Swiss-Prot record:
GO terms for biological process: adenylate cyclase-activating G protein-coupled receptor signaling pathway; regulation of cytosolic calcium ion concentration. GO terms for cellular component: extracellular space. Keywords: Disulfide bond, Receptor, Secreted, Signal. The gene is CRSP2. GO terms for molecular function: calcitonin receptor binding; hormone activity. Residues 65-85 are annotated as: Disordered. This is Calcitonin receptor-stimulating peptide 2. Residues 26-81 form a propeptide. Pfam families: Calc_CGRP_IAPP. It comes from the Eukaryota. Residues 72-81 have a biased composition (Polar residues). Residues 1-25 form the signal peptide.
Length: 127
């Protein structure tokens, strides 16, 4: 597993050293004898190789993150499903009821609360 974390950086490092000329071996024949066997990569080949390495690294990190979320999600569902005793169920129902009450108050209650709002007439007391 540790190798896969290091492999993108290793590949990029090798590519950089290769382009810098550090990893090129001494040729047995002159480069002028056979121009088709060039030891350098073109700009397009470098871009394609670098893009592939970065894409592989991003996919690897996405898989690791997804696995972490799945393991966290499974532990949370196990904790939620273990709530079968009386106080736990009561607390859960109380939370649902409080959320429903807030929703009803926010959507159905008028903001101008006075006697006329509900159809009642305010009668002044005659002295």
């Amino acid at each position: 597993m540790g190798f896969w974390k290091l492999s993108p950086f290793l590949a990029i490092g090798l590519l950089v050293m290769y382009q810098a000329g550090i990893l090129q071996a001494a040729p047995f024949r002159s480069a002028l004898e056979n121009p088709l066997e060039s030891a350098t990569l073109t700009e397009d080949e470098i871009c394609v190789l670098l893009t592939a390495v970065v894409k592989d690294y991003v996919q690897m990190k996405a898989r690791e993150l997804q696995q972490e979320q799945e393991t966290e999600g499974s532990s949370l569902t196990a904790q939620k499903s273990s709530c079968k005793d009386g106080p736990c169920v009561t607390n859960r129902l109380e939370g649902w009821l409080a959320r429903a009450e807030r929703m009803v108050k926010n959507t159905f209650m008028p903001t101008d609360v006075d006697p006329e709002a509900f159809g009642h007439q305010h009668k002044e007391l005659a002295a």
